[in-house]
Amino acid sequence: MALVTLQVSSLDVGSNITPVQDDEKSRRKRMQRRQSFVMVKGAALLLQDEGEPIDTREPLSSSGPNEQQIHLQSMLRLLREEDTLTLAVRLEPVRSCLTRYLLVVSSTGKSNVEETLLLGVDFPHDGSLCCTIGTVLPIWSNTQVFLDGDGGFTVTSGMDIRTFKPISVQTMWSLLQMLHKACESALSNNVISSSLYSGLIYYQSNRSSPQVCLNAWTASPDIESARRDPATPEREETERIIKLKLRDILRESDLENITSKEVRSALEQHTLCALQDYKEFIDNEMIIILAQMDRPSEIFPYLYLGSEWNASNLEELQKNKVSHILNVTREIDNFFPELFMYLNIRVLDEENTNLMQYWKETHAFITTARHQGSRVLVHCKMGVSRSASTVIAYAMKEYEWTLETAIRHVKERRSIVQPNAGFMRQLQTYQGILGASKQRHSYLWDPSSAPSLPLMSPPPKNFSSPTTSPLTPRLQKMNLRTLMRSISEMEAADTISEEKESTVVLEETTLKQNFNVLESSSNNLQVTPKRNEHVLSKEQIIQEEKKVMELEKGPEWVVKNNVLEEMKETEERELPNFELPMSLNQSRERDQETIKESSVITQGSSSLDEVFESSTPTRSPEMASYACQKIQYFEQHSEGYSKVCFVDNLQSVSEEEKVTLVSKQLQTDEHGERKARITRQQNVIDTHEEL
């Protein structure tokens, strides 16, 4: 471990800079600022912030700066003035890129929020004094870090996935700590993925690493099929000639009888050179060409569905005018990143893979290629499950098709399509999401957008209903707000009904107690007939009723109304005194005795004083009508009286029914007495008018 202080300036320290303007002086002053780093093997950690006063005396070194210090000084030159290099970590070499660093760069944005970027830097060789930017990866709130094992980890930022592998455990631990701190800061500040960092565009526009290094930064550890690194110009030319001749030979030969050695001999005759060193290359190319003979399937005029072999066939891609390639694999590399626009969906062909979360981006990617007038190739390993599911989802959304229609359309053009069970469930869910999205403007959710119903003219007067069954009227859709209100009312009604049930139970308990008291007291009561209540005999009442009906001038309903009131009076006068007849025959005998007594009493003339002193009714038309109706009423309701009379004796009647009958009678006592007094006064007035 060592402490290193570096001057953030150009390497031309010995050149004389003449300040001409004030801004030039300030710029030179800024460039003379220094930064201190803690240097360990393969890593450099910032020790103090720039702008902090430090000792300007540099330590003397007879050997000069080492390789790591030279690399650090070169990397500082790539940064903007407002950016700070927080950590620099050396990574393991990949392919021909031997010297690679990952830089953690931070700065303060316009909103005073700390912005963090990851820069991948390439050096042509160890002693090089210059470096280039190979990749740029921003740290957002949705950025995640996953450990891959063997000291490597993967960083996902939006749709970008990058894999890094530091050269030691110590450097890996330092880098993971710094990444965790940056991710937590972005999450707390809610730095969304759509926000643009001030330095993001600047560094992306200055990516200048060789294509081999660019491919190494985008490589995935799970890649099984990768593109070959370019070789020497002479070997590249020979391989290009082999590809062209090999395709022609395989197209013209009988593939069932020709061998690999015969193919190589035919190539040597065409190239006029020995191809002993190219045997492995020739075998690989033969397999690729045989696989590429299965052309990609044209699902739509602008969309092809194929396999990894179709994605590696440059001639076929250019012939089909493909400009965009959608790679829905984790194990297949991008073969021509410098020629085509790529979108990588790094997923595996497993049932638990969440592929639906990427369908919004894939739809936008395919739509962009279509609007540009070009074509897009969607591929996975074999063009059967992952890429096919993505194309089916695109067709469902773009053309508003059902899942069944989209699958049938794709299978008609590529019969081997077969999404796995997990992707099929996601497609069914996606169909429901699209269906719900279509209804977002429906008046079920927005009542103001409901179409006005046409007014129907009334049917003609002479319209007669047809003999056949009428058409069922169309049910109107219920408004969502009305539906929710009705649900709330139903809940309130349930609460009220529960309260009523509890009240009824309480009332029944109280009535049972009252009934027990009444039952004990009713046994001591003696039934005494009222001597002042008299009625006419049945024969006299019928005769007088006929005469009265002939002489009546008023409406019949008035007379009946009076009769009903008198009937209620008689009933209510008998019940409070518990004058309950034991049977219907006894009740009739008592009525007959009363009629006989009344006939004897009414033979004499009654004066006005006698009328007021006695409540005996006279033979007026109203009273005669009342008496007649009274007899009819007793005959019709005799069954009801019998039930009241035998309340204590009938064993079949339950205790609850007894309580109900007695409670009803008690409630009508007071009301009946008031009505009886009013009716007597009315009868007296009528008698006075007749006299």
Curated annotation (Swiss-Prot):
Single GO BP term: actin cytoskeleton organization
SUPFAM superfamilies (alphabetical): (Phosphotyrosine protein) phosphatases II, DEK C-terminal domain
Alphabetically ordered keywords of this record: Actin-binding, Coiled coil, Cytoplasm, Cytoskeleton, Hydrolase, Protein phosphatase
Superkingdom per UniProt: Eukaryota
Catalytic machinery residues: 380 (phosphocysteine intermediate)
Keyword Coiled coil: yes
Tyrosine-protein phosphatase domain: residues covered: 295-436
Main enzyme class: hydrolase
EC number: 3.1.3.16, 3.1.3.48
Gene3D superfamilies xrefs: Homeodomain-like, Protein tyrosine phosphatase superfamily
GO cellular component annotations of the record: cleavage furrow; cytoplasm; cytoskeleton; midbody
Bias type Basic and acidic residues, positions: 587-596
Chain coiled-coil ranges: 532-580
GO molecular function: actin binding; phosphoprotein phosphatase activity; protein serine/threonine phosphatase activity; protein tyrosine phosphatase activity
Compositional bias per record (Polar residues), positions renumbered to this chain: 597-619
Annotated InterPro entries: DEK_C, Dual-sp_phosphatase_cat-dom, Phosphatase_SSH-like, Prot-tyrosine_phosphatase-like, SSH-N, Tyr_Pase_AS, Tyr_Pase_dom, TYR_PHOSPHATASE_DUAL_dom
Catalytic reaction(s) noted: O-phospho-L-tyrosyl-[protein] + H2O = L-tyrosyl-[protein] + phosphate; O-phospho-L-seryl-[protein] + H2O = L-seryl-[protein] + phosphate; O-phospho-L-threonyl-[protein] + H2O = L-threonyl-[protein] + phosphate
Subcellular location: Cytoplasm, Cytoskeleton; Cleavage furrow; Midbody
Domain DEK-C: from-to ranges: 236-291
Chain positions covered by the region annotation Disordered: 585-620
Oligomer and partners: Interacts with actin and this stimulates phosphatase activity.
Additional record remark: Tyrosine phosphatase activity has not been demonstrated for this protein to date.
Function: Protein phosphatase which regulates actin filament dynamics. Dephosphorylates and activates the actin binding/depolymerizing factor cofilin, which subsequently binds to actin filaments and stimulates their disassembly. Required for completion of the gastrulation movement and for cytokinesis.
Family stated for the protein in its record: Belongs to the protein-tyrosine phosphatase family.
Full protein name: Protein phosphatase Slingshot homolog
Originating species: Xenopus laevis (African clawed frog)
Lineage, broadest ranks: Eukaryota, Metazoa, Chordata, Craniata, Vertebrata
